[in-house]
Amino acid sequence: MTESGDDHPRRLRVSKELRGLIRNLHPDLKRKVRAALKENLRDPGVGKPLREELGGLRSFRVGRIRIIYRDSAPHIDLVALGPRRQIYADTLRLLKRAR
Protein backbone atom coordinates (compact mmCIF):
# COMPACT_ATOMS: atom_id res chain seq x y z
CA MET A 1 0.00 0.00 0.00
CA THR A 2 1.47 3.34 -1.03
CA GLU A 3 0.18 6.87 -0.62
CA SER A 4 1.73 9.87 -2.31
CA GLY A 5 1.58 13.25 -0.71
CA ASP A 6 3.83 16.29 -0.83
CA ASP A 7 6.26 14.38 -3.09
CA HIS A 8 6.94 11.94 -0.23
CA PRO A 9 5.47 8.53 -1.01
CA ARG A 10 5.02 6.45 2.12
CA ARG A 11 4.80 2.70 2.16
CA LEU A 12 3.04 0.51 4.65
CA ARG A 13 4.94 -2.63 5.66
CA VAL A 14 2.74 -5.42 6.98
CA SER A 15 3.82 -8.93 8.00
CA LYS A 16 2.15 -11.97 6.43
CA GLU A 17 0.61 -12.76 9.82
CA LEU A 18 -1.02 -9.34 10.09
CA ARG A 19 -2.15 -9.45 6.45
CA GLY A 20 -3.94 -12.71 7.22
CA LEU A 21 -5.50 -11.23 10.34
CA ILE A 22 -6.82 -8.24 8.38
CA ARG A 23 -8.03 -10.49 5.57
CA ASN A 24 -10.11 -12.51 8.06
CA LEU A 25 -11.81 -9.53 9.72
CA HIS A 26 -15.53 -8.94 9.29
CA PRO A 27 -16.02 -7.09 5.97
CA ASP A 28 -17.26 -3.87 7.64
CA LEU A 29 -14.35 -3.80 10.08
CA LYS A 30 -11.89 -4.71 7.31
CA ARG A 31 -13.11 -1.73 5.27
CA LYS A 32 -12.69 0.58 8.28
CA VAL A 33 -9.20 -0.75 9.04
CA ARG A 34 -8.07 -0.27 5.43
CA ALA A 35 -9.49 3.28 5.36
CA ALA A 36 -7.70 4.06 8.64
CA LEU A 37 -4.42 2.69 7.27
CA LYS A 38 -4.73 4.92 4.20
CA GLU A 39 -5.33 7.93 6.47
CA ASN A 40 -2.28 6.91 8.46
CA LEU A 41 -0.15 6.89 5.30
CA ARG A 42 -1.21 10.48 4.64
CA ASP A 43 -0.54 11.58 8.21
CA PRO A 44 1.47 9.18 10.40
CA GLY A 45 1.00 11.52 13.35
CA VAL A 46 -2.71 10.72 13.67
CA GLY A 47 -2.04 8.05 16.26
CA LYS A 48 -1.40 8.49 19.95
CA PRO A 49 2.28 8.13 20.94
CA LEU A 50 2.79 5.21 23.30
CA ARG A 51 5.01 5.49 26.37
CA GLU A 52 7.35 3.55 28.58
CA GLU A 53 8.25 0.13 27.15
CA LEU A 54 6.20 0.81 24.02
CA GLY A 55 7.87 4.17 23.41
CA GLY A 56 8.57 4.82 19.74
CA LEU A 57 5.28 3.21 18.73
CA ARG A 58 1.95 4.86 18.05
CA SER A 59 -1.61 3.59 18.35
CA PHE A 60 -4.91 4.56 16.80
CA ARG A 61 -8.43 3.28 17.25
CA VAL A 62 -10.75 1.74 14.69
CA GLY A 63 -13.91 0.75 16.54
CA ARG A 64 -12.86 -1.69 19.28
CA ILE A 65 -9.61 -2.45 17.46
CA ARG A 66 -6.28 -0.74 18.12
CA ILE A 67 -3.65 -0.55 15.42
CA ILE A 68 -0.07 -0.29 16.69
CA TYR A 69 2.55 1.03 14.28
CA ARG A 70 6.02 2.56 14.02
CA ASP A 71 6.79 5.52 11.78
CA SER A 72 10.08 4.52 10.14
CA ALA A 73 10.08 7.10 7.35
CA PRO A 74 9.64 6.50 4.48
CA HIS A 75 7.85 3.41 5.79
CA ILE A 76 5.15 2.83 8.32
CA ASP A 77 5.57 -0.56 9.96
CA LEU A 78 2.35 -2.15 11.16
CA VAL A 79 3.33 -3.87 14.41
CA ALA A 80 0.08 -5.26 15.82
CA LEU A 81 -3.67 -5.11 15.58
CA GLY A 82 -6.25 -6.27 18.11
CA PRO A 83 -8.77 -5.39 20.82
CA ARG A 84 -7.73 -2.76 23.35
CA ARG A 85 -8.04 -5.06 26.36
CA GLN A 86 -5.06 -7.16 25.25
CA ILE A 87 -3.22 -5.48 22.39
CA TYR A 88 -0.73 -3.49 24.46
CA ALA A 89 0.36 -6.52 26.53
CA ASP A 90 0.52 -8.67 23.37
CA THR A 91 2.64 -6.03 21.61
CA LEU A 92 5.04 -5.83 24.54
CA ARG A 93 5.45 -9.63 24.52
CA LEU A 94 6.02 -9.57 20.76
CA LEU A 95 8.71 -6.90 21.07
CA LYS A 96 10.49 -8.73 23.90
CA ARG A 97 10.54 -11.95 21.86
CA ALA A 98 12.01 -10.09 18.87
CA ARG A 99 14.98 -8.78 20.90
Describe these PLM feature segments.
Residues 17, 55, 86:
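Residue-level recognition of oxygen-bearing side chains
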Residues 24, 40, 81:
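Conserved catalytic core of Hanks-type protein kinase domains
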Residues 20, 39, 86:
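Active-site micro-motifs of SAM-dependent methyltransferase domains
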